A protein has these predicted regions:
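Secreted, cysteine-rich disulfide-bonded mini-domains of extracellular proteins
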Residues: 1-77
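Acidic glycine-/aspartate-rich tracts in secreted/extracellular proteins
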Residues: 6, 40-41, 207-209, 291-294, ...
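Non-catalytic extracellular/lumenal accessory regions of secreted precursors
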Residues: 63-98
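Propeptide-to-catalytic entry region of secreted or membrane-anchored zinc metalloproteases
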Residues: 78, 86, 113-115, 124-283, ...
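Extended extracellular/luminal ectodomain segments enriched in beta-structured repeat modules
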Residues: 100-108
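Stable alpha-helical elements in mature extracytoplasmic
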Residues: 217-227, 335-339, 401, 405
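The catalytic-center signature of Zn2+-dependent metalloproteases
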Residues: 252, 326-403
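Active-site-proximal segment of zinc-dependent metalloprotease catalytic domains
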Residues: 268-354
Length: 412
């Protein structure tokens, strides 16, 4: 996600602006760091919100089931996406086997369940050795278990130092997952060359004065896209095709102002494959709304429903990203940075440093900040994947980040 840096704007020591007589805390919920109102009981929260953790001394106002989107719909088959619903029982879950070609430079596995939670455990190489352990060297990839819960897309290699995973000469791999569902499904996508082009489907959700018919000519939209192009082109990646769609009727009225983070799941579920071919399906769904008014996540600018998101399959809770058009007319360049940031998440990039400085991305050539609340003084503050929008130019990108962008299955 991207948030305004409250500390840079004069917030309290936690980086949050608390209402008079109330306290707030910065928390990571569903993979997103944001400010939440503290509480001791449900009555401390506004209508429609509960005190999560009431009685523990560390409660916060949120929605019941905040991290529990509904089970994904079954993906449409065909067009190069082959869904398999066969697996082997192992202790604590299931083992999914699949073949990867010797020529592949990257692959994605997307396990999902209609009945239970799904979380990756280990990836076994063709020789039986552990190529990725999601409790240790690949722990950064478990974020989707908290965001999506019932679907867990994983991409390999997730950073340059993990190239050996795809340098095995091809063969049969096994992804072990934790789940109580005895019949989970999955699909596998792989590519034999690096990609350089990204296709996007931009859904306009009540954005003032902009429709699918005039979006391509809108000055703010052009500046926004040019900013993203400028960032990504430094690593040989560009935007190829942009398709525009209007979200209309009751859906527009329901989602144009997002007041509940959970609504983002329903919003991206409105996406549809732009065409029947795999090339058309391998596109990024972007939902541009009027704005966020989430009291418990003040300053939120954008949110990706997955890191990485669900590749190639549309119409589900992990099929896109949402960001605000609030600054499109006044700061289209900053909106473009937000777009580049959220697309980066959807393609598999993490924040250079997470809030509080306790975690960082796995990419070895991105700087790390001991406390991102320091804002502009952080060594990674100018990187486009810094967790806060600081209101200045944040267009830096590293070679390691470019490595990930070129290998994602959504870059063709």
């Amino acid at each position: 996600c991207t948030s305004l840096d409250c500390a840079e704007l004069g917030g309290d020591s936690a980086g949050c602006n608390a209402p008079t007589g109330r306290s707030t805390s910065c928390r990571t919920i569903s993979g997103s760091s944001a400010c939440y109102l503290s509480c001791g009981q449900d009555s401390d929260c506004r209508a429609g919100y509960d005190c999560i953790g009431a009685g523990t001394g560390d409660g916060y106002c949120g929605t019941a089931g905040q991290t529990s989107p509904t089970a994904p719909t079954a993906p449409d088959t065909g067009g190069g996406i082959n869904v398999v619903c066969q697996s082997t029982s192992i202790s604590g879950g299931r083992a999914l086997t699949f073949d990867i070609a010797a020529s592949s430079v990257a692959f994605a596995v997307v396990p999902y369940s209609q009945a239970d939670l799904v979380a990756p455990s280990r990836l076994l190489l063709p020789n039986g050795q552990v190529g990725a352990n999601f409790a240790t060297d690949h722990a950064f990839m478990t974020v989707n278990a908290g965001i999506l819960q019932t679907v867990a897309p994983v991409v390999f290699p997730a950073a340059p130092q993990f190239q050996n995973i795809v340098q095995q000469g091809g063969g049969r791999y096994t992804l072990e997952i934790n789940t109580s569902d005895d019949s989970p499904c999955y699909y596998v996508l792989q590519k034999s060359v690096e990609g350089s082009k990204i296709d996007m489907n931009i859904y306009l959700v009540g954005v003032n004065g902009i429709t699918a018919a005039n979006a391509a000519q809108n000055a703010g939209m052009r500046t926004m896209l040019d900013t993203m192009r400028r960032i990504y082109s430094k690593e040989g990646v560009t935007i190829r095709t942009v398709r525009y769609f209007d979200v209309s009727g009751t859906d527009r009225e329901r989602y144009r102002i997002v007041r509940n983070i959970n609504d983002c799941y329903g919003l991206v579920s409105l996406s549809r494959a732009p065409g029947p071919t795999l090339a058309e399906k391998l596109s990024v769904n972007v939902f541009l709304i009027q704005g966020f008014q989430v009291a418990e996540a003040e300053g939120l600018l954008g949110l990706s429903l997955g890191a990485p998101g669900v590749p190639g399959v549309h119409g589900n809770e992990g099929a896109g990203l949402v960001f605000t058009s609030e600054y499109l007319s006044s700061r289209a360049d900053m909106t473009g940075q937000t777009l580049a940031h959220e697309v980066g998440h959807f393609l598999g990039l993490r924040h250079t440093t997470e809030h509080g400085g306790t975690e960082a991305d796995p990419i070895q050539d991105t700087p790390v900040c001991s406390n991102p609340d320091r804002g502009t003084s952080c060594p990674d503050a100018t990187n486009f994947m810094f967790p806060f929008s600081l209101g200045n130019t944040q267009e830096g990108i590293s070679d390691g980040q470019g490595f990930v962008l070129r290998r994602t299955l959504l870059t063709q």
